[in-house]
């Protein structure tokens, strides 16, 4: 059994993820477990942003890693391994949405179902984050979450969402301004 070194980066370095995908392609199940451990939060976060339902997001997260196991030999290390993983996730989410044609808003109970240790936020911070994110448009929210949660660069987000880079940049900066204004407004009310 191969042991993989732990990484201090959130989802692992690109080189480390590429090594894991190569090991998965060679049939090493422990590499899949390591990849899952390093990337599950980002994959789950993206699926939740598309599906707005914790049960469906959990299903898709599981499906992503089954897909990775089945298709790792097809991964070409010329691109970002995290980008490939999130593209798989996005495609599975879009297929699910086409099947169910469901675009619901994430309920408070579903926000509460996200494990607190996964986010590292207190209940109060999670509530505030939920409020601020709910005021953003769908695409703005997805771009902010992809950048903040997965650490993807804006050009990677543009490729993943199939949007022009200037559009991603403007939507990201607009979303940050909206969030800042909301937070400053909340702080003004507290004083």
State what each model feature region is.
Residues 96-120, 124, 190:
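Short, basic/polar amphipathic helix motif occurring as a linker/hinge flanking DNA-binding modules
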Residues 1-12, 23, 109, 122, ...:
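C-terminal edge and immediately downstream basic/flexible tail or linker adjoining helix-turn-helix-like DNA-binding
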Residues 2-11, 25-34, 44-63, 156, ...:
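Short, charged helix-capping/linker segments at alpha-helix termini
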Residues 70-77, 86-107:
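Arg/Lys-rich amphipathic alpha helix in sigma70-family domain 2
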Residues 37-41, 49-52, 135, 145-152:
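Short helix-capping/turn signature of helix-turn-helix
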Residues 45, 59-66, 79-91, 170:
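Structural recognition of an alpha-helix C-terminal capping motif at a helix-to-coil junction
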Residues 16, 37-40, 44, 54-71, ...:
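Conserved RNAP core-binding helix
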Residues 90, 94, 140, 149, ...:
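DNA-recognition helix of helix-turn-helix
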